[in-house]
A protein has these predicted regions:
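N-terminal Rossmann-like NAD(P)+-binding domain of SDR-like oxidoreductases, especially those catalyzing
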Residues: 1-176, 230, 298-299, 329, ...
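Amphipathic alpha-helical recognition patches that constitute DNA-binding helices
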Residues: 11, 144, 172, 189, ...
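Short aromatic-enriched loop/helix-cap "lid" or pocket-rim segments at secondary-structure transitions
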Residues: 39-42, 130-132, 181-186, 219, ...
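Residues in well-ordered alpha-helical elements
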Residues: 61, 73, 85, 92, ...
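Short-chain dehydrogenase/reductase
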Residues: 95, 143-154, 185-192, 215-216, ...
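Short histidine/acidic/glycine/proline-rich micro-motifs that form metal-
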Residues: 146, 177-182, 212-213, 242
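Hydrophobic alpha-helix immediately C-terminal to the catalytic Tyr-X-X-X-Lys motif of short-chain
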Residues: 152, 156, 160, 190, ...
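C-terminal substrate-binding subdomain of Rossmann-fold SDR/epimerase-dehydratase oxidoreductases
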Residues: 199-202, 206-339
């Protein structure tokens, strides 16, 4: 079985590649390294660094060259621009990568007989929901650029299924955590950020009171479902959630306990949440304070009953166990990174 993984040098893509390699699948790995890191490609039992092709998913000739032999069975499209402020700052780039990149894969998949495309989507599309837990069919159109790119990508995926009879499953990830989560980027995911600050002995700054709640999913549990959906036909959209959530304060206290470090966090004004992106606060129409307030303080909890019923999937990794694994891997990485 031959599988193309895009975004293979990223957090999720690299972990997926490692699992499928251990399963004996033949892999074609691509990444343009805009967010991926070579460090993600080394595992105790295998080094993928020389196997990853430096390629953008928008590269029409490049993608065609990988697929025109007709021997790629499945595509996992994990590539994309995910950080919310990056998408707000460069919306045309976000749309081009997250939407046009997928369409490039779908079109080549259509032409060259791919059995299935599994698309990385997001539960950020539920940002305007008010009833929880959120099911796949509970939906209000999102506000921010990133979830809108994923919403539109799902519509194009469904169009290809309805028009050509292709099969695409969109996995709506909750907040994914685990080894290789990117702690080095400009605006790291919360879990990676708090571990990094604790490791360096710095005071973490939370732009809230710490009581907002998010649902999380451990990367290995996500991969279990990504494999389970591979044989389903037609279009599908599936929540990938642990069916529970945690507050910022609960997560931070757990990280303190695991790392044996205790640093009092600072709670700051949510208006400065994206202060590392000053351009968003400039111009005739700066970003609205209420939008930042909503993004920071929103409540998220997705219902995973559909994934359990249709695919027999159940998340297995507890938050303590998963966070411990993440901390172990991140600390090892940070030993070689200047503070």
């Amino acid at each position: 079985m031959k599988i193309l993984i895009t975004g293979a040098a990223g957090f999720i893509g690299s972990q997926l590649a490692h699992r499928l390699w251990k399963n004996g699948d033949v892999l074609v790995l691509i990444d343009n390294f805009s967010f991926g890191h070579e460090d993600n490609l080394t595992f105790e039992d295998h080094d993928f660094r020389k196997e990853v092709i430096r390629m953008d998913i928008r590269d029409k000739d490049g993608i065609k060259s990988l697929m025109e032999k007709g021997d790629v069975d499945y595509i996992y499209n994990i590539a994309g621009i995910a950080p919310l402020p990056d998408c707000q700052l460069n919306p045309t780039e976000a749309i081009d990568v997250n939407l046009n990149g997928l369409v490039n894969l779908l079109e080549n998949g259509r032409r060259y007989g791919v059995k299935k495309v599994i698309q990385a989507s997001t539960n950020a599309m539920y940002e305007n929901e008010t009833e929880f837990p959120t099911r796949e069919d509970d939906f209000k159109v999102p506000t921010l650029i990133y979830p809108n790119t994923k919403y539109c990508a799902e519509r194009f995926a469904q169009s290809y299924c309805d028009t050509y009879g292709m099969s695409v499953t969109c996995l709506r990830f909750a907040n994914v955590y685990g080894p290789h989560v990117d702690c080095l980027r400009k605006q790291p995911p919360f879990v990676a950020y708090m571990v990094r600050e604790l490791y360096y002995g710095r005071t973490p700054v939370f732009h809230s009171n710490g009581e907002q709640r998010r649902d999380y999913i451990y990367v290995d549990d996500l991969i279990d479902l990504a494999i389970a959906v591979r044989e389903s036909k037609g279009f599908d959209a599936v929540n990938v959630s642990s069916n529970t959530n945690y507050s910022v304060n609960e997560m931070y206290q757990l990280a303190e306990d695991i790392m044996g470090k205790h640093i009092k966090a600072e709670y700051a004004d949510d208006a400065h949440y994206w202060e590392r992106y000053p351009e968003l606060y400039e111009g005739s129409y700066p970003i609205k304070k209420e939008i930042l307030n909503h993004e920071i303080n929103k409540y998220s909890l997705c219902d995973n009953a559909y994934a359990q019923k249709k695919y027999g999937w159940q998340p297995k990794v507890s938050m303590r166990e998963g966070l411990s694994r993440l901390i172990e891997a991140e600390v090892e990485l940070l030993k070689n990174v200047k503070a």
